[in-house]
């Protein structure tokens, strides 16, 4: 049974933590330490090489929070946290690729139980020489070496809160600085990747043993297993070394004047992210928010943000986006008093919002240099020019333009419209919402390599903001909550979302037929051939439209593919 041969019946996994908290009038403190261990579910066989492979995970977390009451109106918060995690795995599987992980599991489900044993008494590993792709998962786990990957995280957070009521009632300020670091060390352990092992197969018909290594090719004597692995001291992975600096200043004001409630907020934030030796990325935001409500009945809100990103040229680096919202708490109106008193209507609110949001996401990796400096021309050094028809290369190295910039690259913009109703009836028995939404995304980023530009352009064209998509739909939510006299509770949540999108503008080829363009269809719309039944005779076969690929393989019984544009070729 390969499952029993590969997996333990159980494994150990545990967590231990200790917390301490307390304080005085001047300082309040909290500290904690936490340890996590995850054991290995695989059985690890003795490989005879002096080390044990397999999997494991250990992590320790520590945290300290200190709140200092510097004055009656000033509070300083210092939060420090760190963790150290060690992940152990076979050296050959530290990359965690799908193929490598599959090799650890394949024996449990792909190998018959009577083909070979995982390991024989003489230390050799089972094999099946008649089929090349049979995998001994026990060998894959036990050999190859063992590696430790150590991940260290350090997080610091300093916050200063100041009550400014001596200036005006309800005014306060808050400033935060955060500094986070991540370090990853790889390649510490034993590298035994390319050292051969002895394999054996026993013929079930004759009982004859067959060894893969019949003799040592170096000296001609019987093959013996030696200790040929090497130790690796480990090294910090520059590509996974991350440093994030974030600082923020915020001003808040909350005030009530009778039935009039007013709030205002102003915020500045800046973020610097760095990875390895790559230049840091920068993002800066200035934002404000104002709200007003009268007697918790009529609501109005206005927001604005002045966002800046290093990914755009100075002319387009900053952009202003704003939004507004209104609301009406119908259930608080005097004419709804009867329904409130009879506990028919708990809450009924109508709301609507409209606004803009900007995005500077030009690709999945913010440190990707091919998409980070798209607003400027890029240059590269290397290569030689060809001097003549004999392909003789020049002795001089090229300094060439590697990418054409576009200084007009700018923010992608989404305009959002939402109209909704929130409700609660019969003391919370039924509650939920109904919402209709419509988004129009414009200035969609199109990478130069994805543009519809003729090949005679001679290179990769500059990237552009050229695209527009509309999305609309609705969301329904219903919550049921009922508690009976015996404290039995019945509850349920139901939700439904329906959305449709349509490409309004796309960088389609100008002369391409409409049915082959993206514009006018959904995003990533699937397309396929249209058939008109089967080819039923050779007359129909020879009269069918030609296929632009493998036309000679077309036979009676195949689909008759419709020549949609009537040019005689499918």
Task: Describe the function of each predicted region.
Residues 1-45, 232-238, 253, 546-565:
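Residues embedded in well-ordered regular secondary structure
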Residues 14, 65-70, 74, 80-84, ...:
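Extracellular/periplasmic, surface-exposed regions of secreted and cell-surface proteins
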Residues 30, 47, 54-63, 305, ...:
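Short, cationic motifs built from Arg/Lys/His that form the positively charged side of catalytic pockets
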Residues 38-81:
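Extended hydrophobic/aromatic segments used for targeting, binding, or gating
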Residues 87-100, 506-511:
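Low-complexity intrinsically disordered tracts that form flexible linkers/tails across taxa
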Residues 227, 502-570:
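C-terminal outer-membrane beta-barrel translocator/porin domains of Gram-negative envelope proteins
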């Amino acid at each position: 049974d390969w499952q029993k041969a590969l997996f333990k019946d159980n494994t150990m996994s545990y967590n231990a933590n200790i917390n301490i908290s307390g304080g005085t009038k001047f300082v309040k403190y909290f500290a904690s330490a936490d340890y996590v261990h995850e054991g290995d579910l695989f059985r690890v066989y003795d490989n005879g090489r002096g080390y044990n492979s397999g999997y494991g995970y250990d992590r320790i977390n520590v945290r300290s929070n200190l709140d200092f009451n510097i004055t009656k109106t000033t509070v300083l918060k210092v939060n420090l946290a760190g963790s150290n995690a060690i992940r152990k795995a076979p050296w050959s599987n530290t990359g965690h690729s799908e193929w490598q992980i599959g090799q650890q599991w394949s024996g449990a489900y792909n190998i018959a139980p009577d083909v070979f044993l995982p390991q024989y008494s003489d230390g050799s590993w089972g094999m099946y020489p008649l089929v090349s792709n049979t995998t001994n998962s026990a060998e894959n786990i036990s050999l190859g070496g063992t590696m430790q990957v150590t991940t260290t995280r350090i997080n610091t957070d300093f916050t200063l809160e100041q009550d400014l009521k001596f200036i005006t009632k309800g005014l306060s300020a808050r400033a935060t600085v955060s500094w986070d670091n991540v370090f990853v060390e790889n390649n510490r352990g034993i590298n035994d990747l390319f050292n051969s092992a002895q394999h054996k197969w026993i013929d079930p018909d004759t009982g004859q043993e067959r060894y893969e290594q019949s003799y040592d090719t170096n000296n001609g004597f019987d093959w013996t297993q030696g200790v040929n692995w090497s130790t690796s001291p480990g090294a910090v992975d520059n590509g996974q070394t991350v440093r994030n600096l974030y600082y923020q200043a915020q001003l808040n004001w909350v005030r009530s004047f009778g039935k009039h409630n007013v709030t205002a907020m102003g915020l500045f934030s800046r973020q610097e992210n760095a990875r390895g030796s790559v230049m840091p990325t920068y993002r800066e935001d200035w934002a404000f928010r104002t709200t007003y409500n009268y007697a918790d009945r009529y609501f109005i809100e206005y927001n604005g943000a002045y966002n800046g990103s290093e990914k755009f040229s100075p002319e387009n680096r900053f952009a202003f986006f704003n939004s507004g919202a209104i609301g009406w708490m119908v259930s608080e109106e005097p004419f709804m008093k009867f329904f409130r008193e009879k506990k028919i209507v708990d809450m009924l609110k109508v709301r609507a919002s409209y606004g803009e949001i900007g995005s500077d996401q030009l690709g999945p990796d913010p440190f990707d240099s091919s998409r980070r400096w798209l607003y400027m021309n890029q240059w590269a050094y290397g290569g030689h020019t060809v001097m003549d028809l004999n392909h003789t290369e020049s002795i001089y190295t090229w300094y060439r333009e590697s990418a054409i910039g576009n200084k007009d690259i700018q923010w992608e913009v989404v305009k959002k419209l939402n109209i909704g109703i929130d409700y609660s009836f019969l003391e919370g028995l039924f509650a939920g919402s109904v919402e209709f939404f419509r988004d129009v995304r414009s200035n969609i980023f199109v990478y130069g390599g994805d543009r519809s530009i003729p090949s005679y352009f001679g290179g990769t064209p500059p990237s552009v903001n050229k695209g527009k998509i509309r999305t609309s739909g609705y969301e329904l939510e219903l919550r049921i909550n009922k508690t009976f006299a015996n404290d039995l509770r019945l509850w349920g949540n139901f939700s439904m979302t329906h959305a449709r999108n349509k490409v309004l503008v796309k960088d389609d080829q100008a002369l391409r037929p409409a049915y082959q363009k993206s514009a006018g269809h959904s995003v990533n719309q699937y397309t396929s051939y249209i058939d008109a039944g089967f080819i039923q005779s050779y007359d129909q076969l020879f009269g069918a439209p030609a296929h632009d690929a493998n036309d000679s393989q077309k036979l009676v019984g195949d689909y008759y593919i419709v020549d949609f544009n009537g040019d005689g070729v499918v």
